[in-house]
């Protein structure tokens, strides 16, 4: 029997928002959301825009609160922010006034690790993501792909049990995205963290994952979960195989009826900048 790292049972999420006429209305984002994530697996979640994929990840990260249901990590109810989880956002979430090395070390600093030790560890992960020579650079001096490498290194540096990734490669060009997908798999194969990965890309989900979960339109729930029985390590050429095409077709068949039927998203409170969420995750005081 597989060991379940994360268990969600009948999770629900509602919030107040403004409709197009500026009137308050209650938005039901998640309802009857059930999911079990196995320890050490790479699980991707697919779904139409606005179905609640990122909302569930934010609840799991402790950045949002469910309004019902049960959510457990390691067999214990999740209470707020879990320090054993790392989060990688689509928007990089780097602290703009910190160097690359200091950005990678920020989680260790929050945990009270001494300066010498945290910088030594940060250099190890800087090397792991292939950014030697950029330690003293600042985020604005890096390309999008390099910034996301720093974000991944930062999340891994304090050795979390679980890595939550919210469309981390969505804003990158196709070549950089495929390169970072392969890099992520290389790192995952070495460390075997439990990864929950949000994406809109069928190809990305299939290439990366052990299993793929497909969500319904809002209110979101898990419609189907299926295994990706493709050998590892996964090389780029895998995308051209008949087996890959088969899984892509299966994912699309599960998703097709949900796409296009998703309700329009009401206007909600403006989101925080991604680096402000990093501050919340660590209790890091940066004047926000």
What is the predicted function of each stretch?
Residues 98-105:
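Short coil-to-helix segment of the ABC ATPase nucleotide-binding domain corresponding to the Q-loop/switch region
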Residues 61:
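Helix-to-loop junction immediately C-terminal to a conserved catalytic motif
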Residues 137-140, 158:
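Conserved signature/switch motifs of ABC ATPase nucleotide-binding domains
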Residues 46-48:
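The feature captures the beta-strand-to-loop junction immediately N-terminal to the Walker
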Residues 105, 109, 116-134, 186:
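Conserved ABC ATPase "signature" region
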Residues 69-81:
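Conserved ABC transporter NBD signature motif
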Residues 163-166:
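Catalytic Walker B motif of ABC-type/P-loop ATPase nucleotide-binding domains
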């Amino acid at each position: 029997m597989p060991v379940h790292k994360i268990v969600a049972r009948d999770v629900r999420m509602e919030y107040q928002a403004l409709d197009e006429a500026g009137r308050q209305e209650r938005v039901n984002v998640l309802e009857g959301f059930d999911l079990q994530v196995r320890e050490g697996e790479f699980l991707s979640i697919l779904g139409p825009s606005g179905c609640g994929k990122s909302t569930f990840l934010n609840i799991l990260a402790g950045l949002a609160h469910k309004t019902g249901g049960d959510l457990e990590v390691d067999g214990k109810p999740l209470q707020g922010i879990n320090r054993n989880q790392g989060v990688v956002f689509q928007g990089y979430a780097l602290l703009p006034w910190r160097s690359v090395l200091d950005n990678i070390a920020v989680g260790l600093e929050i945990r009270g690790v001494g300066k010498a030790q945290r910088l030594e560890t940060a250099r190890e992960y800087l090397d792991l993501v292939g950014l030697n020579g950029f330690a003293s650079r600042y985020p604005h001096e890096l390309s999008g792909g390099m910034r996301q490498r720093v974000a991944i290194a930062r999340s891994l540096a304090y050795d979390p049990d679980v890595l939550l990734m919210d469309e981390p490669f969505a804003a990158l060009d196709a070549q950089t995205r495929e390169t970072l997908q392969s890099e992520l798999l290389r790192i995952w194969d070495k460390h075997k963290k439990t990864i929950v990965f949000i994406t809109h890309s069928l190809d990305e989900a299939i290439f990366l994952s052990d299993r793929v979960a497909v969500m319904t339109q809002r209110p979101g729930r898990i419609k189907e979960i299926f295994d990706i029985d493709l050998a590892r390590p996964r090389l780029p050429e895998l995308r051209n195989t008949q087996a890959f095409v088969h899984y892509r077709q299966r994912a699309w068949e599960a998703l097709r009826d949900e796409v296009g039927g998703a309700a329009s998203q009401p206007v909600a409170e403006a989101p925080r900048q991604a680096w402000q969420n990093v501050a919340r995750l660590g209790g890091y005081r940066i004047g926000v």
